[in-house]
A protein has these predicted regions:
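Short, Lys/Arg-enriched, disordered terminal segments
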Residues: 1-6, 208
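Short, structured beta-strand/loop micro-motifs enriched in basic residues and often containing a Trp
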Residues: 5-15
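Short, well-ordered loop/turn sites that connect or cap secondary structure elements
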Residues: 23-24
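Structural motif
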Residues: 27-28, 33
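Feature captures the catalytic cores and cofactor-binding loops of soluble hydro-lyases/lyases
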Residues: 37-169
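C-terminal binding/interaction regions
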Residues: 140-208
Length: 208
């Protein structure tokens, strides 16, 4: 579902395809509810090894991240820092991962490409980016770590299933229509760059 609060658009898990239909690339949103860290090795286990992911991420969100966790008593944990990792490393797995798990929101750093865009378009999900360099601030939005699965992978790769409140800001980089904010902007930026090079090179001959 979607909530509006103090001018913020907040996605609340579980998220449906209907919830995402009016969200466009470039929009700024926030996330409340279930968010599970899930990066390289977890993607490999699901896609290459065919293992069932032990956290139900269907209609929920994953975060490409390797957080810093503080162990507490009674098998409980505290989120210390949770900065995003580069999403492009998961590009080769993301289509099959989305198809298999039914995840609805993918949070990461930087853009993704054709396979992820196809998954967003076909299965009704989105990719969003959270600003890098704000890992401690992002951790404040984690209210509780509810589960920790695949602990054999070590702290960065463990599936940390968190309950978050207004996690963000998140910039929509791929929407559920498959439009890609980073790729579309590259075309526009390169066009402007070429135009400026032509103008400058007419005055400064050694450029071309």
């Amino acid at each position: 579902m979607i909530e509006m609060k103090d001018g913020k658009k907040i996605l609340v898990t579980p998220v449906s395809a209907e919830d995402l239909k009016d969200i466009k690339i470039g929009d700024i949103i926030y996330l409340s509810g279930s968010l599970t860290t899930c990066r390289d090795v977890a993607h490999r286990r699901v896609v290459e090894e065919g293992r069932e992911i032990p956290v139900d991420v269907r209609n929920n969100a994953i975060l490409h991240a390797g957080p810093i966790i503080r162990p507490l008593e009674n098998d409980r944990f505290e989120m210390v820092s949770v900065g995003p990792t580069t999403s492009m490393r998961m590009e080769k797995f993301e289509y099959e991962f989305v198809k298999t798990t039914g995840v609805r929101v993918i949070v990461g750093k930087g853009g993704m490409k054709e396979q992820t865009a196809a998954a967003c378009r076909e299965f009704g999900c989105i990719h969003v980016v959270i600003p890098a360099g704000c890992a401690v601030v992002a951790a404040v939005a984690v209210e509780e770590i509810e589960r920790a699965e695949w602990r054999d992978l070590g702290m960065p790769e463990t599936l940390w299933n968190c309950r978050v409140r207004e996690f963000g800001p998140l910039i929509v980089s791929i929407d559920s229509r498959g439009r890609n904010y980073f790729e579309e902007n590259k075309i526009e930026y390169n066009k402007k760059k070429d135009e400026q090079i032509e103008k400058i090179s007419a005055q400064v001959r050694f450029i071309k």
